[in-house]
């Protein structure tokens, strides 16, 4: 069924398709239809449950940040069977983002390229929505980024302001210093700059607090960031974000578009970083990048991820993707003799 709908949707510009999808989910959430379709999409099995950074996840498959930037449809997304939802990225200031077109499909590669630029309604508006709207029963996190116009030196105050507006209603906070689409943002992954941001947020009461790292960091820089996270007692690390690098295997003309690449081509690289991070910390790792099948999710779990997230796979696989992954994970756990997902975390380390 999704194949027919996908053909129609893929005939439209990617961002138009996203807006149509979001509008449909918004209506479903408003009228309560998400509660009905949740019965079709949700896999309920205690073996899938994971406890990480103070939260209980009914299953390890989450919706990554970027899909619901303004926290408009978390209940509708949870109804698709996801075990957690991460909204955002949210910035202190309202931002239009970069000029369109800024989202591109690479269908032969099951990939996307985006240069959205943290387009969102701003912390005041998103925070008010989070405070006013009921949230789903699964954990909801918020991804926060730096406003484009804020100088790098003022980043700690910028992030802290955003947290003060959006942090109370959610279950965890992710500091995004790794998007390639805000000028200079990745410079904040340096130890001193990152420490200033994280310490300011901790002083403001942000907890659980995680940091999201880039797959393009040199291993020494990743090791430094993990060491800092350990020293500060962060609650977890998200590995990874999109990459600006392009594998030679990409065949679509849009592969040359500026922006971050996500989807199948970054799966192995993301898993390598999950493993690298997990070997250096006792804190939970969130694995992101190229998760589209149960095998993809299981690979990251065995490499050290407590939970995983996806976005691009929802575009290509449709609304059943979380259900298929969770059903497949149960089969993989049974095959390998694990009693639960938690037992499989880090099995390959």
Curated annotation (Swiss-Prot):
FMN binds at residues 65-69, 89, 143, 176, 212, 240, 263, 290, 311-312. Residues 244-265 are annotated as: Disordered. Disulfide bonds: none annotated. Binds 1 FMN per subunit. This is Dihydroorotate dehydrogenase (quinone). InterPro entries: Aldolase_TIM, DHO_dehydrogenase, Dihydroorotate_DH_1_2, Dihydroorotate_DH_2, Dihydroorotate_DH_cat, Dihydroorotate_DH_CS. Substrate binds at residues 69, 114-118, 176, 181, 241-242. Keywords: Cell membrane, Flavoprotein, FMN, Membrane, Oxidoreductase, Pyrimidine biosynthesis. Transmembrane segments: none annotated. Its cofactor is FMN. It is found in: Cell membrane.
């Amino acid at each position: 069924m999704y194949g027919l709908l996908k053909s129609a949707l893929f005939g439209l510009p990617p961002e138009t398709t996203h807006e149509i999808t979001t509008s449909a989910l918004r209506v479903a959430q408003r009228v309560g239809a998400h509660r009905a379709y949740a019965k079709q999409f949700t896999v309920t099995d205690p073996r899938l449950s994971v406890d990480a950074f103070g939260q209980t996840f009914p299953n390890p498959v989450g919706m990554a940040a970027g899909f619901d930037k303004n926290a408009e449809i978390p209940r509708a997304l949870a109804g698709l069977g996801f075990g957690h939802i991460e909204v955002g990225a949210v910035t202190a200031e309202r931002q239009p983002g970069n000029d369109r077109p800024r989202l591109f499909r690479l269908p032969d590669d099951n990939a996307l390229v985006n240069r959205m630029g943290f387009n969102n309604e701003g912390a005041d508006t998103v925070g008010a929505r989070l405070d006013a709207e009921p949230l789903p029963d699964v954990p909801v996190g918020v991804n926060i980024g730096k406003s484009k116009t804020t100088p790098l030196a003022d980043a700690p105050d910028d992030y802290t302001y955003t947290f003060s507006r959006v942090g109370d209603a959610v279950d965890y906070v992710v500091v995004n210093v790794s998007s390639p689409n805000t000028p200079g943002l990745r410079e904040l992954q340096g130890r001193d700059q990152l420490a200033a941001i994280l310490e300011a947020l901790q002083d403001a009461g942000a907890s659980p607090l995680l940091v999201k790292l880039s797959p393009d960091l040199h291993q020494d820089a990743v090791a430094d960031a993990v060491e800092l996270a350990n020293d500060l007692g962060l609650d977890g690390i998200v590995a990874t974000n999109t990459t600006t690098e392009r594998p030679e295997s990409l065949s679509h003309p849009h592969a040359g578009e500026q922006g971050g690449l996500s989807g199948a081509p970054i799966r192995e690289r993301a898993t390598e970083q999950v493993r690298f991070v997990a070997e250096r910390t006792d804190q939970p790792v969130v694995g992101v990048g190229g998760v589209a099948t149960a095998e993809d999710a299981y690979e990251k779990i065995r490499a050290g991820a407590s939970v995983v997230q996806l976005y691009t796979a929802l575009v290509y696989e449709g609304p059943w993707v979380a259900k298929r992954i969770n059903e497949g994970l149960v089969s993989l756990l049974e095959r390998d003799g694990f009693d639960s997902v938690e037992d499989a975390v880090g099995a390959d380390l």
